[in-house]
Every structure is written in C-alpha cells, then in structure tokens.
Amino acid sequence: MKTIAVNSFKGGTAKTSTTLHLGAALAQYHKARVLLIDFDAQANLTAGLGLDPDCYDSLAVVLQGEKQISEVIRSIDSSGLDLIPADTWLERVEVSGSLAADRYSHERLKTILSTIEHQYDYVIIDTPPSLCWLTESALIAAQHALICATPEFYSVKGLERLATFIQGISSRHPLNILGVTLSFWNYRGKNNAAFTELIQKTFPGKLLNTRIRRDITISEAAIHGKPVFSTAPSARASEDYLKLTEELLFLLRDI
C-alpha cells in the first residue's frame, strides 16, 4: 500500500481537486483499490464526492479510539474508490479526548492505517492548507508527499515554509517528495519562467512536467459530486489529470 499526502501551504491551489482526480483516475482507469482520506475540516473533498459532511463520521472518532477505521470508510462507486469523510471535529481533535494527553499523538494515524495496508493499493490524504497537527500526522503516516502550487506569488513563496516543515519531518520519518504539481496553468503566462525557477530552487528536480490548466468543468463536476471524468470526460481537465496520474505512476513504479 502506497500512502500519499497531498499538501499546500495556501488555499486555492487545487489541492483537493488534485486529490480527488488522482484517486478517481487510479480507481477508474488503472483498476486500483483506492482510499481517499479527507483530513481537512473544510470537508471540500467530501462534498466534492457528493457526501454531506454533517451526516458522516470522520477519522476523528478513530483517532480518539471510539470507532474502528472500517466503520468510517464509505464506498463512492463500484470502481474501487472509497472515502473517509471529514467533519468539523477534525479541527480540534488533537486537543480533546485521549489525544490531548498523548505526546506521540502524531503517530496515531500511521498506526491506524497499518491495519488496512492489505485492503488498498493507494491511500491518498487531503491535508489542510496549513502547517498544523493534521498535516504533520498525515506526512508521518505517508511514504510520499505531493505538493500543490499555482503560478502566483503567495503560492510559490509559501512553498519555502512548506519545504522547511517537510524537511523537519523527513529527518525523523522516511518521506519522499513525489513532486510539485502546478494548477490553474496558462501556457502564455508572462511570469511562468520566474515561478518555475523559484519552485526548482525550493524543490530541486521535483517540478512535475504535467500542468493542470484552468477549466470550468472542474467546478461543474464538483457541483454534481463527481469527478470530471464522469461529467466531462473529453474536457482538458480530464486530459490533464490523466496525464498527471500517468506521470506519478511512472515515478512510483520502483518505490
């Protein structure tokens, strides 16, 4: 089982959309068994797959020892895509209940996921766009980190802080930076070279070749609670996310 934490330091980087479509592509087109984990209290991944966050338990109850992980997994479709939804309790889970007194609470998610390692080919975790307990727990539980950015000043500058955060974790836990993916890409953007140069400086050799172009069909798919592969299979967003999935599979082949 390969576990990937999808990260950003700023909202609006298509982090959740990337998580959703990577998982959907692996399940639908590569016949993989995929578990998506919405680990962001905003619950956009949950809503984007057509579930109401107010109606389901999140990993919070599992982290607190109140339920088993099998009790919070929801089947999304017959392709092999499952989801653990998010809820607002995630936002404060580390300061309540049994986690509050556990000095090793960051390790708990890793332990929980080890109990299902034979059930899935991939676990993909959508983390909050901040350097918090949830993000640290996800990175400790993961073998790989996928970083999302946009060709904007604040997004790219935030990568420097994220790089320092990840470096601190990888010094204590094995963690591979799978790559940096750029979304909302305009091939005619006048500052493209400057942005890509800064990313290469922050994460040398990690900028992925695939660019996710801006496409309204992604937002339209979210309204229907489905991946864009289902609502607009011929859209450029579908093409881009399939290419991204292929590129990541190539990078993962020997790891």
Swiss-Prot record:
Recorded superkingdom: Bacteria
InterPro entries for this protein: AAA_dom, DNA_Partitioning_ATPase, P-loop_NTPase
Family (UniProt): Belongs to the ParA family.
Protein name listed in UniProt: ParA family protein TC_0871
UniProt source species: Chlamydia muridarum (strain MoPn / Nigg)
Highest classification ranks of the organism: Bacteria, Pseudomonadati, Chlamydiota, Chlamydiia, Chlamydiales
